[in-house]
């Protein structure tokens, strides 16, 4: 049954194609643009380069943009809002809650910073703020207020609870989970939705298991899942995607290149999940390259299009550093891929 549902979806994709986002009443473009690189993720990005990148995304027909207070410690929301407020056409905006951008002041001291993630290179263009995790009722409401100011819009389409889960928080997960569930974080999001301040909410995370848990606590409309439904990681297809469909929760998929290995040439960068790729992943990727070569399909194109073959997925997000990369991603996204290619991947056990 799942195969039939997948094969009914036409694979001649357009980046500008509008898709219904679950029950939110929103339509998003099949290809969305994430803004983390604009905050100086891994390397500095000038204002001129950031503006050019956003304009290239708009010019490519993209009308769904994702940001977060964390990205550049507020910088990305400023940049995105400045661009979108000048456009005659409304785009869909998602941002996130769970982190507040703040500093010490008279009458307020900040808690100690959590242990630094060794994989986190920091923000080369970040604003001069510190991030403080706060998933409580007041924290969510303040985060929404702050994002309104940075983006310059009185309403925000979607709010994702950012990085809740053990992958980010480790031993402190229960503390933050209790703030979200018992401390009113989900209640705040529900109130914002009921008042029309947002159209929907969900989680923005790197682990599908925490979205599954959250569905037991709140009525999620849409969630952003990074790196956990791809050509190299499909555990969620059986364990989670059917639940999302049953609960009427739309999905946006990010991290389709799994930290770069699926966009790199054969023998190039071999990073998977922010670390050196294990041997079994390299073997699987090389076999994907073999089949892609046989059908004259760029592996990056297959990686981008694969998640959208499942009807639970409404859109994918890309994060790029230049207008040229946006244009290349659009070419990959719109590449014609024959059904025989996907059938070959299935026969080899590379997709289900």
Give, region by region, the residue ranges found by the protein language model.
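N-terminal binding-site loop/beta-alpha segment at the start of enzyme catalytic domains
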Residues: 2-114
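Beta/alpha (TIM)-barrel catalytic core signal, keyed to glycine-rich beta->alpha loops juxtaposed to Asp/Glu
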Residues: 13-15, 49, 83, 145, ...
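Short amphipathic alpha-helices and their capping/turn segments at secondary-structure boundaries
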Residues: 14-24, 77-92, 140-155, 238-250
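Short, well-ordered coil/turn segments that N-cap beta-strands
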Residues: 26-31, 61-63, 88-91, 153-157, ...
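Short, acidic/polar
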Residues: 44-57, 136-150, 206-213
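Structural preference for long, well-ordered alpha-helical segments within the folded cores
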Residues: 56, 64, 146, 150, ...
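Charged, glycine/proline-rich intrinsically disordered loops and linkers
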Residues: 104-131
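Short, solvent-exposed loop/helix junctions and linker helices
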Residues: 133-137, 234
């Amino acid at each position: 049954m799942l195969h039939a549902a997948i094969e009914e979806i036409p694979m001649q994709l357009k980046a500008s194609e509008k898709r219904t986002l679950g029950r939110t009443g929103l339509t998003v473009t099949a290809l969305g643009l994430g803004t983390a690189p604009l905050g100086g993720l891994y390397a500095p990005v000038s204002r001129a380069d950031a503006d050019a990148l956003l304009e290239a995304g708009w010019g490519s027909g993209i009308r769904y943009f994702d940001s977060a207070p964390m990205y550049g410690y507020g910088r990305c929301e400023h940049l995105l809002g400045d661009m979108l407020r000048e456009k005659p056409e409304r785009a869909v905006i998602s941002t996130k809650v769970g982190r507040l951008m703040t500093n010490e002041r008279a009458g307020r001291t900040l808690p100690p910073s959590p242990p630094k993630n060794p994989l986190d290179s920091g923000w080369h263009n970040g604003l001069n703020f510190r991030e403080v995790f706060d998933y409580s009722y007041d924290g969510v409401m303040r985060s929404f207020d702050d994002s309104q100011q940075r983006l310059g819009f009185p309403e925000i389409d979607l709010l994702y609870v950012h990085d809740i889960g053990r992958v980010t928080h480790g031993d402190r997960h229960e503390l933050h989970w209790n703030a979200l569930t018992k401390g009113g974080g989900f209640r705040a999001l529900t109130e914002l939705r009921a008042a029309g301040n947002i159209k929907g909410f969900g989680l923005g995370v790197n682990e599908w298991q925490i979205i599954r848990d959250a569905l037991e606590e709140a009525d999620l409309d849409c969630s952003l899942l990074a790196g956990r439904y791809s050509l190299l990681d499909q555990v969620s297809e059986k364990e989670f995607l059917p639940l999302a469909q049953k609960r009427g929760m739309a999905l946006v998929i990010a991290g389709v290149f799994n930290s770069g290995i699926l966009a790199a040439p054969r023998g190039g960068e071999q990073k998977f999940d922010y670390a050196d790729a294990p041997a079994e992943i390299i073997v699987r990727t090389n076999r994907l390259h073999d089949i892609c070569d046989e059908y004259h399909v760029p592996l990056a194109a297959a990686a981008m299009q694969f998640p959208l073959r499942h009807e639970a997925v409404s859109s994918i997000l890309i994060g790029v550093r230049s207008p040229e990369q946006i244009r290349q991603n659009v070419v990959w996204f719109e590449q014609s891929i024959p059904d025989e290619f996907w059938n070959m991947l299935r026969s080899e056990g590379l997709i289900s």
